[in-house]
Amino acid sequence: MVAERRLRVVVIGEEAAGVQVLRGLMALPTPPEIVAVLTRSPAEGGARPVVYESAQKLGLDIWPSSSVRSPDLAMRLRNAEVDLLMNVHSLFLIHPSVLAAPAIGSFNLHPGPLPEYAGLNVPSWAIYEGARSHGVTLHWLDDGIDTGPIVWQERFDVDSTDTGLALSGKCVRLGVPLVFRLATVAATDARLIPREQQDLSRRRYFSAGPPAEGRLDWAQPADAILRFVRAADYAPFDSPWGHPRAQLGGVKAGVAKAAATGVAATQPAGTIVELDDSGAVVATADELIVVQRLWLDGRYLKPKELLAD
């Protein structure tokens, strides 16, 4: 790399993490040159394209995010003399020739500890499984999915009240600074970027969809049910899992929020023991829980609104 010129990077990004990376890179003491941002455009629909809007405000060039699947992008990156390709919360599979195009390498910010939590929606899976700790990993990109060598990893506790959104937020808060650290080290001496091979014998891969096809079973212990509900809770945003569905008083609805009571259940699992303005008290395999909010036909409801005679 020519010492006189700044580090040249391309960012593939979505969501709040992508916005924070763009702003933070430009605020570094020696900011890299952001050659382009690849992100979803408003024309593609879906959630608000916050990275697209941020890139526009910052005056950055925007390229279609879908182009990462084409080898044509590799030539474009080489012609632009790109040093780093940074993937932040974009789910497109990147063509191998694109990964190999940057002079230094391509990197991914993954919201989970590797190799134990590879795949999609892993903050939710961690809560569902009852993990006591979680992590965020910055790693080199290779031809596999979340298999590349680790650059840095931050681990942290999972609180008993963490929702899917809360745990994802922790990943962003601790993970985004790793991207800034990478840019700083790469600009100084790229040979100092760590490259720790993963122990793939410990690898577990998680799919995007929810466990049990999104069905909640009242015959499970209360703790397992509450973890499922919290894992799917991304309010006020849409949940990638939806809300776990259950039969309650003859109605099938998503359980959006629930809480423990610590009271032993003596009734059959699924029995509504009490129904008032605070929610529906429901029996599980071992304890009573309070179902506080349901989801049906695109809106949230109090159980009393749906279940009262």
Model-derived regions, located:
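Residue-level detector of beta-strand face positions
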Residues: 245-247, 279-281
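A short acidic-to-branched-hydrophobic micro-motif
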Residues: 217, 247-263, 288-297
